[in-house]
Amino acid sequence: MNFKYIVAVSFLIASAYARSEENEIQSLSQRDVLEEESLREIRGIGTKILGGVKTALKGALKELASTYVNGKRTAEEHEVMKRLETVMRDLDSLDYPEEASERETRGFNQEEIANLFTKKEKRILGPVLGLVSNALGGLLKNIG
């Protein structure tokens, strides 16, 4: 009789432990899904903001380029124009990320790809802002 109780209690303990393990695994997977969704939302918001900034920068750069094209250029202005054209190509390359799709097919995970884009955006946006400020400063100096 005692043996039946021992077996029944041990069976209940084992099933309760298995249920708790299963619940823990489900909660971890739910947490992972929620984290992934929140990362996607954050990246989506960042992408929209970056898209707006890129559009504004492209407009400003095109305006600067047309200003330089319409007048005579010195060697320094010609160099600035070449840099602006390079920056425009780099900004366009952000719209067509072939690099990321190649890396993704090689087995990189999404977080590494996002880090690559962030590094590329920082690498491009830093010089862009510097060039725009230098070009605007030069224009203001020439006007004034």
From Swiss-Prot:
Supply one GO CC term from the record: extracellular region
InterPro entries, A to Z: Bombinin (IPR007962)
Q: In which tissues is it expressed?
A: Expressed by the skin glands.
Q: Name one Pfam family in it.
A: Bombinin
Query: Where is this chain's protein located in or outside the cell?
Result: Secreted
Location of Asparagine amide modifications: N70
Sequence positions bearing Isoleucine amide: I143
Q: Which GO terms describe its biological process?
A: defense response to bacterium; defense response to fungus; killing of cells of another organism
Q: Where is the signal peptide?
A: 1-18
Q: Which residues form a coiled coil?
A: none
The answer to whether the entry has keyword Lipoprotein is: no
UniProt keyword terms in alphabetical order: Amidation, Amphibian defense peptide, Antibiotic, Antimicrobial, Cleavage on pair of basic residues, Cytolysis, Fungicide, Hemolysis, Secreted, Signal
Cleaved propeptide residues = 19-43, 74-123
Q: Does the keyword Acetylation apply?
A: no
* Protein family (similarity comment): Belongs to the bombinin family.
This chain's function reads:
Maximin-2 shows antibacterial activity against both Gram-positive and Gram-negative bacteria. It also shows antimicrobial activity against the fungus C.albicans, but not against A.flavus nor P.uticale. It has little hemolytic activity.
Instruction: From the Swiss-Prot or TrEMBL record, give the protein name.
Output: Maximins 2/H8 type 2
Q: Native species of this protein?
A: Bombina maxima
